[in-house]
Amino acid sequence: MIKAGAVLVALLAMGMPEGHATKKDLWMFIAEMSASLRTLSNTSVNDLPLQFTLTKDNEYIHFYHADDVRLADDMRITGIDFRVSKERDGMAPLLNFSPSGLCITLDAVKKHYPELVLTDYPRGRSGNEVTSYTAPEDINGQKVSFSFSVNKPDCLDSVVINAGND
């Protein structure tokens, strides 16, 4: 019962699955998911603030997916995918998702992450390529990257949180 109450509180704080309103914004969502990933282990996936479902795995990695989350101002978080190593010393947990509903510009991202570094750029091979900017590693070794697609270069396409050194 206590765990169910904690999950409810976390969901209320994080944003609600599709269909429920909340006042949380994208930046709070990123901060809370980053904080959750810091203490994550393969056995604590169920302790994350979102309900993740195992979608596939291989010899080394579990792949999870979560339902869309509605945030304030008609923002939604979609395509929420999470990877975690099966091995204690394996790759760092990785969370990626796409914001939708409002166009988040690079200037808006830089207001929250002013020290972004260009880490990837289109090479002309596909319309699905992205330009990515990564914030400096925090004290826990986490990095947050922001990608803008060739097809819609002015609006944030996806966010990746790499939960540690690897």
PLM features: what roles do these ranges have?
Residues G15-G124, E129, P153-D166:
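Short helix/turn-capping signatures at newly exposed starts of structured segments
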Residues L11, S85-E87, P136-D138:
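Generic marker of residues within folded, mature protein domains
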